[in-house]
Amino acid sequence: MSKRDYYEVLGVGRDTSEREIKKAYKRLAMKFHPDRNPGDKEAEANFKEVKEAYEILTDSDKKAAYDQFGHAGVDPNRGGGGYGGSADFGDVFGDVFGDIFGGGRRGGQRQAARGSDLRYNLELSLEEAVRGLTKELRIPTLAACDSCDGSGAKKGSSPTTCGTCHGQGQVQMRQGFFAVQQACPTCHGRGKIIKDPCNKCHGEGRVEKSKTLSVKIPAGVDTGDRIRLSGEGEAGEYGAPPGDLYVQVSVREHAIFQRDGNNLYCEVPISFSKAALGGEIEVPTLDGKVNLKIPAETQTGRMFRMRGKGVKSVRSHAVGDLLCKVVMETPVNLNERQKELLREFEDTLTGQSKKHSPKAEGFFDGVKKFFQDLNS
């Protein structure tokens, strides 16, 4: 049976923040937890599915692989066995869900949250994508407050341990048969109290800021490629590690070339006389114009391959080709003399269709036979 989409399992969108993913997970895990649904196999299966989705979507590497390749990107067996993790009901809440059913990190203080990952959509021209370049990107983000060094407390003071939860960030409450832990209402789950908050960040430890990064874009990138910059995401809470920045590449349509992998395609118009008599034509490439030899009697639609004139692979040393499709252009805006010459030329072909236009002759012979058979 095929697996459901992880985002669908948690009921979130692909651009949902990690914080919202955690909220969705917490709500669904409470709903399907075996302690609340004893003997219910369907609830147990749903619980495992929810946990699996959460563990993938809150791991930046696994999430990136899943976003790009789907379930195959996070399947350790690549086609067999499915998800490699286990749904251990004893430790499932140790990460983010330690406040439910009395689980969680016993005896340890709440850990400050890692910074959120950021995404930057970068649009490139085909030439930029093929050759590579260095781009200056201006990124709006949350940065550690330089006034309090990310502590949230005014310089010269320090956060103090919360007296309500004793630094745990959680308090225990009884709900029927269950001992439920919830975020401490005094410190809002932080485990610390900032009595004298920093004037710049107002006790948050982070401030909104824009930073400029110089990002090297490798030659050969294409739409859908993603570049990861470790540690360039939002600053973590109160000194926790920062998130990562993902640069999502898209390539604009080109006026001449179409790209398919490492190959480039283009259409080149040629005159009737050039197609019939042959000769050389100029063909555009990303490196400049080159001459292409057209054999006599070339038919419209013929494809010519120019090896090594495509795109160098971003993952290897292979270079694609340029494939040129010649399209014969019917002359327009003819003067009387030109029309007369064409009529004379047409007269010279009378009765010689099989010799000069074998495809057309074969086609019309087939049409004639079709109507004869139809009327017989």
From Swiss-Prot:
Occurrences of domain J (ranges): 5-70
UniProt gene name: dnaJ
Subunit structure: Homodimer.
Matches recorded under PANTHER family: CHAPERONE PROTEIN DNAJ, DNAJ HOMOLOG 1, MITOCHONDRIAL-RELATED
Cellular compartment(s): Cytoplasm
Protein name per UniProt: Chaperone protein DnaJ
Gene Ontology, cellular component aspect: cytoplasm
Species of the source: Shewanella pealeana (strain ATCC 700345 / ANG-SQ1)
A Pfam family matched in the record: DnaJ_CXXCXGXG
